[in-house]
From Swiss-Prot:
It catalyses: a 1,2-diacyl-sn-glycero-3-phospho-(1D-myo-inositol) + UDP-N-acetyl-alpha-D-glucosamine = a 6-(N-acetyl-alpha-D-glucosaminyl)-1-(1,2-diacyl-sn-glycero-3-phospho)-1D-myo-inositol + UDP + H(+). One of its GO terms (cellular component) is glycosylphosphatidylinositol-N-acetylglucosaminyltransferase (GPI-GnT) complex. This is Phosphatidylinositol N-acetylglucosaminyltransferase GPI3 subunit. SUPFAM superfamilies: UDP-Glycosyltransferase/glycogen phosphorylase (SSF53756).
Length: 452
């Protein structure tokens, strides 16, 4: 029999992004392996209630108040009744939460631990220690992950960051990278490429991403004019939206780059490949990055990558596919971009093999199989005493400083009082079980993983 798994996160379709696509593709491959998966997220405008996606993937859109960038208002306890009801209806065995900034992820782990379920958390981001937001998120994560069964990070740098932020044992933290659907990011047809080069003897640099400060938008608005002034045959395509969008508009107008810089705004994910295939170079100026899925997608389209070396980026692609900036600065990024332009112009590097290499390196089925190994491990080796409420409350008291530990302890006690109240008001044996979508039998790979 396969596992019954619940993915919890504030971020999911119709919003598009790296976390959202990670959850979707991982869930689809887990279903292909014979497991049952539901996703619990908040409502998005008219998407309220239960929706079914491809392959029988069920999504619960729970109506909750959203405060900032699709994150729900944190209340600690108010989500417990509905999440408990869903977990019992779906006979969930493993709760897998995603994202340090997701309220649903944090509260879902807390409620699942209280109910005695196995819990897994995947972190997709890097956080610092020198601003109020990072400190708050780190403290919250320390509380939430006190009784976690396993943590997954998308890069080794992300793992190191997680250990420092939460003081968790490295033994319970695994590294499983993101992946890409290489079939969705095939390079342009060689004949089309030849025709394009004959009709427009230009080098096109593509930038795709959310236009936020942490994604290097301030750097890009200074880099693009410098590169354009140095190379008459270079054009830019910028796709994305965010608070820095107006800065790009002002940059284009002030430097009179209307004919050389296309500002596309937000682009649907199904159109990202079409945008990438118009370019020769992909420029990534991010200030912080745990993995960088867009780099893999761009390389899969045979683009040469110019990027910073922050976070987990150096782990993503081999050196022959990338040109790194020595420092995260305008001058170094301009220098790296100039180097990439000269490589493309002189045809010193054949990028036509990038797609095949990427398709061999990254595959969602491999990610799913490695994740199932973690599910199997925590289900077979963990003791029932690990979810004893006295032990978990004691663990909360041992965490952090004198004030924090008492706050954690208070939250833990109130959580268990609410748990017993819900068990009395809404007994689990009176909750109707949801019928399961007809699924495949568990694959041989999963059986072998369990046996080993």
């Amino acid at each position: 029999m396969g596992f019954n798994i619940a993915m919890l996160c504030d971020f999911f379709y119709p919003q598009l992004g790296g976390v959202e696509f990670h959850i979707y593709h991982l869930s689809q491959k887990l279903i292909d392996l014979g497991h049952s998966v539901v996703i619990i997220t908040h409502a998005y405008k008219d998407r309220v209630g239960v929706r079914h996606l491809t392959n029988g993937l069920k999504v619960y859109h729970v109506p909750f108040f959203v405060i900032f960038r699709e994150t729900t208002f944190p209340t600690v306890f108010s989500t417990f009744p509905i999440i408990r009801n869903i977990l019992l209806r779906e006979q969930i065995q493993i709760v897998h939460s995603h994202g340090s900034a997701s309220t649903f992820a944090h509260e879902g782990i807390l409620h699942a631990n209280t109910m005695g379920l196995r819990t897994v958390f995947t972190d997709h981001s890097l956080y610092g220690f020198n601003n109020l937001t990072s400190i708050w998120v780190n403290k919250l994560l320390t509380f939430t992950l006190t009784n976690i069964d396993r943590v997954i990070c998308v890069s080794n740098t992300c793992k190191e960051n997680m250990i420092v932020r939460t003081e968790l044992s490295p033994d319970i933290i695994s590294v499983i990278p993101n992946a890409v659907v290489s079939e969705d990011f095939k390079p342009r047809d060689p004949t089309d490429s030849t025709k394009r080069k004959q009709s427009r003897d230009k080098i096109v640099i593509v930038v795709i991403g959310r236009l936020f400060p942490n994604k290097g938008s301030d750097l890009l608005t200074r880099i693009i004019p410098k590169v354009c002034s140095s190379h008459e045959d270079v054009e830019f395509i910028v796709a994305g939206d965010g608070p820095k969008f107006i800065d790009f508009q002002q940059m284009i107008e002030s430097h009179r780059l209307q004919k050389r810089v296309q500002l596309l705004g937000s682009v649907p994910h199904e159109k990202v490949r079409d945008v990438l295939c118009q370019g020769d170079i992909y420029l990534h100026a991010s200030l912080t990055e745990a993995f960088g899925t867009i780099l893999v997608e761009a390389a899969s389209c045979n683009l040469l990558i110019v990027t910073t070396q922050v976070g987990g980026i150096p782990e993503v692609l081999p050196n022959e596919m990338t040109v790194y900036a020595e420092q995260t600065s305008v001058s170094d990024l301009v220098q790296a971009t100039n180097k990439a332009i000269n490589i493309i112009r002189s045809k010193a590097l054949d990028t036509s093999s990038f797609h095949d290499s990427v398709s061999k390196m990254y595959d969602w089925m491999d990610v799913a199989k490695r994740t199932v190994e973690i599910y199997t491990n925590i289900s077979s080796t963990s003791s029932a005493d690990d979810k004893d409420w006295m032990k978990m409350v004691a663990n909360l008291y041992k965490r952090d400083g004198i004030w924090a530990k008492h706050l954690y302890l208070l939250c833990g006690i109130v959580e268990y009082m609410l748990f017993f109240l819900l068990e009395w008001l809404y007994p689990r044996d009176e909750i109707d079980l949801a019928p399961k979508w007809p699924k495949k039998s568990v694959s041989n790979e999963t059986k072998e993983a369990r046996e080993t």
